[in-house]
Amino acid sequence: MTITYEWRGDVDNSALNELHAEGFGHPVGRTDWETRLRRHSLGWVCARDARGRLVGFVNVAWDGGAHAFVLDTVVARAARSNGVGAALIRAAAKGSRDAGCAWLHVDFEERLRPFYFDACGFRETAAGLIAL
């Protein structure tokens, strides 16, 4: 499977809404991803198959300084277990580093611990959370 990865790649709202719905198990929404990403994100990575179909995505928010934050990592079912997710994170880390960030943060559901720690190289750190 040939996959290409692009930092701040072109975003098709329909394709990303469909991928997001498939990956997170909710109905297809009508989010204006392009506007949201350009307004609030340091960058994002789009993964596309040989036909140009969006098969993976990760968003990278930031604090305007040294800290970047991984959000919405998603891979199409048909492309899973082929290293696409880990490659998305590597591309997100490179884009964040190139932008001058020193840290890439992630929070996740416990079931994703092996992915983020083993496949992607994150390490455990103390953090806090308030549900709003």
Please annotate each region the language model reported.
Residues 1-32, 46-51:
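Short amphipathic alpha-helix that is part of the acyltransferase structural core
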